[in-house]
Amino acid sequence: MKFVTWNCNGALRKKTEALDALDADVYIIQECEDPAQSTDAFRDWAGSYLWVGTSKHKGLGVFPKKGNTVKLAAWFGAFKQPGVINSNSSTSWSTADLKLFLPFTLNEDFQFLGVWTKAEGADVFSYIGQLWKYLQIHRGQLRRERTILLGDLNSNSIWDGPDRRWNHSDVVEELRDIELQSTYHRQTGEAHGQESTQTFFLHRNLEKAYHIDYVFTSGDLLDQARVEIGDPKTWLNFSDHMPLLLVIDTSQRTKGF
């Protein structure tokens, strides 16, 4: 099976033909508009989709193709730092406070978490901090076989800060602890922060390139998985992000959680 994660940089309705050329089973798209508030043609393309967002123009969408079925997973919870009396956004939070996450199942078989981490104003837990907070609540749900976490994390270990427990490197280790590893880094042998292939080009400038989009797969899928990153010569015409194409050899899969 083939899965694509891509930050489309808005106006997905104008870019579906380019996506269709990748021939994926499911598309997980960041920064896309809500099909329910868009054109008839885009709604037809979207099919039985899932979507969450902060405005009708920018959200996180899941679009199944080829007869595949996705179902929203009801992941709700809260976390409070132990031993803390006063409660604020740094010491306690709920799933609804965090942006943007979309957990779902595919064909009652694979479990996915689509991610587009966001900046939350002056919150020190912006971007990768949002995912770190999410893990404190939902680590248990993610510790399953046939699990895939993927999306635009807006993060890399090159931006790790001192005295901060929610750095990119810390999150990578927390994911490793629950048997989720980056497919790209597994297949290339490269360390986080030393990537030779980039996924994001600031202002679509080839000289301002970063690796901030990821696919993490559970340990049982690692040997069956490979990831390809789109060519900027093609994809910079559509977005500042490159699509990541995840291919899973399902012939080795035993169905069901």
Question: Language model features by range: what are they?
Answer:
Residues L12-K14, P35-S38, G59, K71, ...:
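Short catalytic/ligand-binding loop motif for oxyanion handling, primarily in non-cytosolic enzymes
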Residues F110-S126, E173-R176:
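Active-site-proximal loop/helix segment associated with metal-binding centers of metalloenzymes
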